[in-house]
From Swiss-Prot:
Gene name as annotated: xkdR
Protein source organism: Bacillus subtilis (strain 168)
Family: To B.subtilis YqbR.
UniProt name for this protein: Phage-like element PBSX protein XkdR
Classification lineage: Bacteria, Bacillati, Bacillota, Bacilli, Bacillales
InterPro entries referenced in this protein's UniProt entry, alphabetically: DUF2577
Amino acid sequence: MRLSEAIKHLAVGAVDAESPVELLPAEVVSVSPVEIKLKENSKLIIPEDAIIIPKRMQSGGDDALEPGDRLMTAALTGGQSFFILDKV
């Protein structure tokens, strides 16, 4: 998914839900498969199939994820998908 498509997806979901997208800090737990944990709930591990990862952060990308990386994510409507915005 291209960045522009992901942003459009976030915007459409927010409008449909009539609530803003929630920004949540997270940390990379593992990279194969990619798993993250949210700072607000360190016991909840988000699996790779619920994470949208920018191409530059995917394995082999210019800024590939590594365990321990701190991230800012955008939770899509209902908290069923998480888009990684950037490392922090």
